[in-house]
């Protein structure tokens, strides 16, 4: 089990500010050598020195930021789960999540991440109004920045959400 190669965005959590572009591919030396010989000819493989510096600068605070991300997400998930206007919260840190025990074994004391899914009760108009009225949270697609973001999928997008999709 496991992955032969892992591609990771350095732009998101590792940089932490969303102001640098970079990525990394991690894997066995033989596979990395193959990538260097083949793919890098087509797509390039050198990060700019300035982006490398900014990512290195951001990586220093990564453990502190991730702990805060997970702590905040846990508190927000618990708050939303108890809100009568929220239909469901999908977050593995909640005891109500169907895979909570598995997540607890796998993540231990490290927390359950900074992302969750939830649904606001009501029709499409009510849900759109909820997103439009947010003052501190930005409606945008990304993650790992120094701001909170929301992506409104809604029942028409991505095949629709159910309480706990299988």
Predicted regions and their residues:
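Conserved PLP-enzyme active-site core in the AAT-like
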Residues: 1-85, 90
